[in-house]
Amino acid sequence: MGTPGEGLGRCSHALIRGVPESLASGEGAGAGLPALDLAKAQREHGVLGGKLRQRLGLQLLELPPEESLPLGPLLGDTAVIQGDTALITRPWSPARRPEVDGVRKALQDLGLRIVEIGDENATLDGTDVLFTGREFFVGLSKWTNHRGAEIVADTFRDFAVSTVPVSGPSHLRGLCGMGGPRTVVAGSSDAAQKAVRAMAVLTDHPYASLTLPDDAAADCLFLRPGLPGVPPFLLHRGGGDLPNSQEALQKLSDVTLVPVSCSELEKAGAGLSSLCLVLSTRPHS
């Protein structure tokens, strides 16, 4: 038996999908959201891929952009991955459901065990699922329903799975994330704090908590690529995006902070953790 939570963030590969021109128009722009600068969004996406590959040392796989899938870059919504198992989700928006096809094929090619959702009554967006290393929390939100959460529990039977009500338009991971194996980070909004309080009641494990001024700053990724002698990384929104949260993030002293920007991609509804899928194809020690 290893240390509880030690499986959190283990990764060798990252999967991303290129930004299509259609992201700047139609559904990709999002109703009522500001106009999106396509070139800037593509630059942000390119920098993210570079950080994953060069800074974190991950093997990067990039699916090509597809104009018929304007929100295709938000592939974090298309799968829930733990160990060698990938649960292919059923996004709330019917227009987004074809996004899972290319992701499924890529994960199959990497040797993961694929689990499908066959229940047409289920909805599940991957960014409503938070894995702590010990257990899963699934946000019951506009995007994910109780049947979707039940399928997460059926798929990952080795872990406790609890449901957390999420109010407003957010996904659970848009409100809180893991700053380390024992630390939950959360935004300061009422919705974020309500979610964290619910998690504290539901869990049997003691987590430290860190409140950040910005909800979007809590949408981060704790990653352990397993590089010799290198501490874990925290991929997070940088000072150019969220300056008010940087001082609080410095309190996470056990990680190497790796800032990235996705302020333009955010206009299409992207949070940081929605822009990539990370997985490990190495045996877990």
UniProtKB/Swiss-Prot annotation:
One GO cellular component term: extracellular exosome
Compartment(s) where it occurs, according to its Swiss-Prot or TrEMBL record: Cytoplasm; Mitochondrion
Protein's name in the database: Putative hydrolase DDAH2
EC assignment: 3.-.-.-
Record carries keyword Cytoplasm: yes
Alphabetic keyword roster: Cytoplasm, Hydrolase, Mitochondrion
Physiological role: Putative hydrolase with unknown substrate. Does not hydrolyze N(G),N(G)-dimethyl-L-arginine (ADMA) which acts as an inhibitor of NOS. In endothelial cells, induces expression of vascular endothelial growth factor (VEGF) via phosphorylation of the transcription factor SP1 by PKA in a process that is independent of NO and NO synthase. Similarly, enhances pancreatic insulin secretion through SP1-mediated transcriptional up-regulation of secretagogin/SCGN, an insulin vesicle docking protein.
Main subcellular location of this protein, as a coarse class: cytoplasm
Organism: Homo sapiens (Human)
Record-annotated active site: H171, C276
One example GO MF annotation: hydrolase activity
SUPFAM superfamilies per UniProt: Pentein (SSF55909)
Post-translational modification (record): Phosphorylated by TBK1. Phosphorylation inhibits the translocation into the mitochondrion upon Sendai viral infection.
Effect recorded for S245D: Loss of mitochondrial translocation upon viral infection. Loss of inhibition of MAVS-mediated innate response activation
Gene behind the chain: DDAH2
Family: Belongs to the DDAH family.
GO BP term, pick one: negative regulation of apoptotic process
Highest taxon listed in the record's lineage: Eukaryota
Reported effect, T211D: Loss of mitochondrial translocation upon viral infection. Loss of inhibition of MAVS-mediated innate response activation
Tissue: Detected in heart, placenta, lung, liver, skeletal muscle, kidney and pancreas, and at very low levels in brain.
